């Protein structure tokens, strides 16, 4: 599995988010697939004993977003559709896999599945991702970080 980036604040795959899921994925270059193996604990449950649907959607979004790496582009989720086929149990061994369906200009279409250890498909997702300019993204990201830092220091002064 890939190492988590300790500076990445992403809830799904970042190593820099103490409350995040810390999902790690492998790029299967030969088959142009992204694969992750994991277990989701009780902190991610909705109904007792079962994983919350929003968490399932997050896992599918994460694996499908990583598929964009095969095109050497940075893309963001524009649309995500999830089919919940079977309940996902807490502490169950799971495999998530994502692959590309097609591309139309700046738009990428990806698919993902979550399976249990027996190979049963528990959830399936389809996503539409839009390619973005990484330099523009980084500039906006830095501006947001600067604004948040200014707001945070103002909040600290106000509480003093």
Residue ranges with predicted function:
Residues 26-28, 99-103:
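Short beta-strand micro-motifs enriched in acidic
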């Amino acid at each position: 599995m890939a190492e988590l980036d300790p500076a990445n604040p992403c809830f799904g795959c970042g190593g820099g988010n103490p409350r995040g899921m810390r999902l790690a994925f492998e790029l299967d270059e030969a088959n142009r697939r992204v694969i992750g193996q994991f277990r989701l604990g009780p902190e991610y449950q909705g109904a007792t004993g079962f994983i919350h649907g929003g968490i399932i959607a997050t896992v599918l979004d994460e694996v499908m977003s990583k598929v964009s790496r095969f095109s050497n582009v940075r893309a963001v989720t524009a649309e995500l559709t999830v089919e919940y086929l079977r309940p996902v149990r807490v502490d169950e061994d799971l495999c998530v896999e994502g692959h590309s369906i097609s591309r139309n200009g700046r738009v990428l279409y990806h698919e993902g599945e979550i399976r249990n250890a027996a190979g049963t498909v528990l959830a399936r997702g389809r996503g539409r991702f839009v390619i973005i300019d990484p330099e523009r993204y980084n500039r906006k990201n830095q501006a947001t970080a600067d604004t948040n830092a200014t707001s945070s220091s103002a909040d600290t002064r106000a509480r003093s």
